[in-house]
From Swiss-Prot:
This is AMP nucleosidase. One of its GO terms (cellular component) is cytosol. Homohexamer. Trimer of dimers. It comes from the Bacteria. The gene is amn. One of its GO terms (molecular function) is AMP nucleosidase activity. Induction: By cAMP at limiting phosphate concentrations. Repressed by phosphate. It catalyses: AMP + H2O = adenine + D-ribose 5-phosphate. Each monomer consists of two domains: a C-terminal catalytic domain and a putative N-terminal regulatory domain. The lineage of its organism: Bacteria, Pseudomonadati, Pseudomonadota, Gammaproteobacteria, Enterobacterales. AMP nucleosidase binds AMP at the catalytic site, Mg-ATP at an allosteric regulatory site, and inorganic phosphate also at a regulatory site. Its EC number is 3.2.2.4.
């Protein structure tokens, strides 16, 4: 038995989502334009009828499927009933939504419906502020007479498993208001359009990795055998094979205007690589993951530098994190530090295999240069000044490296069900007298960065080949929403 009944097919649902969303956006933009030019206020009765609302997507399963799939990490129902969420930017998310709906429609015979919701689209999400010239009273008027962002209605309760049961269960981890909030922040922080983000994400904490990524990306765009067709850069540069002197074209400092600039190496099928320079510290790491998560990336990897804690390590060695000591504290309120963050087997294997492939060394030689162990992430940049306390923590945890971002990124991946991994390169050994000096650091990075970045890129190639198998069931909760 199936309960598709008179419901929509996935394609029909997506088309209706597009139509309802565009209808609301056009109405809201027109109303804003009328207010700015003539002072005309939006029609309150029309608003009550849903003039500016997001579309709502509801999927219902009657529990009749005899052999529901149990091995995949998404596209599953935990119980019979109706699941719903609001949707924004359906064109941007069309491929993702189609995949999720198709699984539920084909494997469960789910009934799909689309209708206007009761939640209005905040006006800042449909206009480009740079195109408006508003005085103080006009800005206040927009906030007074048009729907605005209400922080009380935005949160991660579903992702954190603390939502209150109602007639409808959540269909996805993020509703439209939460997604729109993060899409706006992503553009602000990274300096690039959200449409350019790719599903395979590299994080780094050092600018030189960006230089190498841009150099390699430009060479890939010029290679007719490469799948990469364009490079989108922080600050607005867009590089293709037709761009003259591409590296010169993006050598300006436009990216410096942005807190966490991003570069997107784009493929025709949207399966490329995004690199984000998150800078230093767990606060930035938490922030970017909070917002990137709404795009539902396939994986994010930390590829940066760290302090080596073991005497046997050498400058330039690698550390593959298999556990984390979370001394970053930025997530303690939502994910207590006593909750273990498991390593993801598929990601660990890809990073190790990529190290062998890129270095060209056999397994035994790789093990001499690659150390697997616990990485400490601290929020104290000067942890060295508390040597006694720090040394005790390192001894108890058997830590092999320290940085300020990796555990935060892994914890956020765990929280938001995004596969995660960490491969760091030892840049200094402060416990053993090997500290970074300016000239020494330059020579080290010139030799190490290219190989390290190539390992991250090769690991992404391996993970891309995994397909849906990359998404691990170990990140699911007991009452997981059906959508990935």
């Amino acid at each position: 038995m199936n309960n598709k009944g008179s419901g929509l097919t996935p394609a029909q649902a997506l088309d209706k989502l597009d139509a309802l969303y565009e209808q609301s956006v056009v109405a809201l933009r027109n109303a804003i334009g009328n207010y700015i030019t003539s002072g005309e206020l939006p029609d309150e009765n029309a608003r009550k009828q849903g003039l500016f609302v997001y579309p709502s997507l509801t999927v219902t399963w009657d529990g009749s499927t005899t052999n529901p799939p149990k091995t995949r990490a998404f596209g599953r129902f935990t119980h019979a009933g109706s699941y719903t969420t609001t949707i924004t930017r359906p064109t941007l998310f069309r491929s993702y939504l189609n995949e999720q709906l198709t699984l539920l429609y084909q494997d469960y015979g789910a009934h799909i419906s689309v209708q206007p919701s009761q939640h209005e689209i905040p006006y800042p999400y449909v206009i480009d502020g740079s195109e408006l010239t508003l005085d103080r009273s006009m800005s206040a008027g927009l906030t007074r007479y048009f729907p605005t962002t209400e922080l009380a209605q935005i949160g991660d309760e579903t992702a954190d498993g603390i939502y209150h049961p109602t007639e409808f269960s959540p269909l996805s981890h993020f509703d439209a208001r939460r997604v729109d909030f993060s899409l706006a922040r992503l553009r602000h922080y990274t300096g690039t359009p959200v449409e350019h983000f790719q599903p395979f994400v590299l994080f780094t904490n050092y600018t030189r990795y960006v230089d190498e990524f841009v150099r390699w990306g430009c060479s890939q765009i010029l290679d007719p055998d490469s799948p990469y067709i364009a490079l989108s850069c922080a600050g607005g540069n867009w590089i293709t094979a037709e761009t003259e002197a591409p590296e010169e074209a993006i050598s300006d400092l436009a990216w410096k205007k942005h807190q966490m600039p991003a570069w997107h190496l784009i493929t025709a099928d949207g399966q490329g690589i995004t690199l984000v320079n998150i800078g230093v510290g767990p606060s930035n790491a938490k922030t970017i993951c909070d917002h990137l998560a709404v795009l539902r990336p396939d994986v994010w990897l930390m590829i940066g530098h760290c302090g080596g804690l073991r005497e046997s390590q050498a400058i330039g060695d690698y550390v593959l994190a298999h556990a984390y000591l979370r001394d970053d504290h930025v997530l303690d309120a939502v994910l207590p530090p006593d909750i273990p963050i498991p390593s993801i087997a598929e990601v660990q294997r890809a990073l190790y295999d990529a190290t062998k492939l890129v270095s060209g060394r056999p397994g035994e030689e790789v093990k001499q240069r690659l150390r697997t162990g616990t990485v400490v992430t601290t929020d104290d940049r000067n942890w060295e000044l508390r040597y006694s306390a720090s040394a005790l923590r390192f001894n108890l945890s058997r830590a092999v490296a320290i940085d300020m971002e990796s555990a935060t990124i892994a914890a956020q991946g765990y929280r938001f069900r995004v596969p995660y991994g960490t491969l760091l390169c030892v840049s200094d050994k402060p416990l053993h007298g090997e500290i970074k000096l300016p000239g020494q650091a330059n020579r080290f990075y010139e030799g190490a960065i290219s190989e390290h970045l190539q390992i991250g890129i090769r690991a992404i190639d391996l993970l891309r080949a995994e397909g849906d198998r990359l998404h691990s069931r170990k990140l699911r909760t007991f009452n997981e929403p059906p959508f990935r």
